[in-house]
């Protein structure tokens, strides 16, 4: 049996609470994230983002004939990686997405599933790039756009030849393989998905395939009134997920906790970091923080650039912290 959680931290807490309720020693079930499960079924390795940027840069320079340096390409490359990932996670048709459609007849033939308003919007967008006397910026945009599909295809082929892939590519390949009727080498008789929320198209279709094979069960973390409020956009996923992937067992209702929120206005990032020090110091002075209280205490930053100032603001009394946040290669 395997349990699939949104992230590894959730899995660690699950193991902690499982050990507390177990009367006797037991072997822990396999704990995975949904990314781990996709990678396991694909047989591919998750490609390193930095190496992918260099690979993408080499292909881009060769296909476009551009003389951009890697530094100049970096921002553009990051955006392309994100776009390619979204294309595959949402199972979009990349060839059609990157089509350079300017003729209304061509739009009507290739995009007959669109409404008249959508066709008009697409035509309006592309027609703006074909006035008499194209500007250099328009020409550059069109030149880049025309190589995007070939860039996407060669980039994926290069990664596949190395036995690697980015998340969306791996997700898509696993789903398409299962939908063709191929049976992945599943080492688990039962897979329980816990606490997932906003699912991409590839994730939905993956869960549907496992559900069809009767090896998946689903449990959703929808306790908050705001999440279940039909007037709140967040509730869209609640009804959709519960209807498509119901739980096989009914769990007892969780006790709702009343949240207390205090808003403190501080204009600068450094000021926010200093106030974190003040708050943590006060909590440590009031009573020695137990290990359980420490586990339930989190500092959530709105900006990754605040990470270093906040780390420097941690009081000396707090000896151990767990940082789960990325930091940019350049600031």
Labelled PLM ranges:
Residues 1-331:
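Nucleic acid-machinery interaction/catalytic patches
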């Amino acid at each position: 049996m395997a349990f699939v959680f949104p992230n590894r931290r959730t899995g660690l807490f699950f193991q902690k609470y499982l050990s507390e309720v177990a009367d006797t020693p037991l072997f822990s079930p396999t704990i995975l994230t949904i990314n781990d499960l996709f990678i396991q079924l694909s047989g591919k390795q998750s490609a390193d983002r930095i190496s992918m940027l260099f690979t993408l840069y080499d292909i881009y320079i060769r296909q476009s004939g551009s003389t951009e340096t890697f530094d100049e390409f970096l921002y553009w490359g990051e955006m392309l990686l994100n776009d390619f990932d979204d294309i595959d996670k949402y199972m979009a048709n990349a060839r059609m997405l990157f089509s350079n459609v300017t003729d209304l007849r061509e739009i009507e033939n290739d995009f007959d599933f669109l409404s008249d308003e959508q066709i008009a919007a697409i035509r309006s967008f592309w027609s703006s790039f074909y006035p008499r006397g194209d500007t250099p910026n328009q020409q550059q945009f069109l030149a880049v756009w025309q190589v995007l599909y070939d860039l996407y295809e060669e980039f994926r082929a290069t990664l596949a030849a190395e036995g690697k892939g980015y998340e969306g590519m791996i997700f898509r390949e696993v789903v398409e393989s299962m939908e063709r009727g191929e049976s992945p080498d599943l080492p688990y008789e039962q897979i329980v998905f816990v606490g997932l929320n906003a699912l991409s198209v590839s994730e939905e279709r993956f869960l549907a395939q496992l559900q069809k094979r009767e090896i998946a069960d689903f449990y959703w973390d929808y306790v908050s009134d705001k999440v279940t409020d039909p007037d709140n956009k967040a509730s869209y996923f609640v009804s959709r997920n519960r209807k498509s992937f119901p739980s096989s067992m009914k769990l007892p209702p969780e006790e709702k906790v009343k949240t207390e929120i205090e808003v403190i206005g501080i204009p600068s990032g450094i000021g926010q970091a200093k106030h974190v020090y003040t708050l943590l110091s006060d909590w440590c002075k009031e009573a020695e923080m137990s290990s359980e209280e420490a586990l339930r205490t989190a500092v959530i930053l709105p900006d990754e650039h605040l990470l270093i100032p906040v780390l420097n603001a941690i009081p000396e009394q707090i000896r151990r912290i767990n940082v789960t946040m990325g930091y940019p290669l350049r600031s």
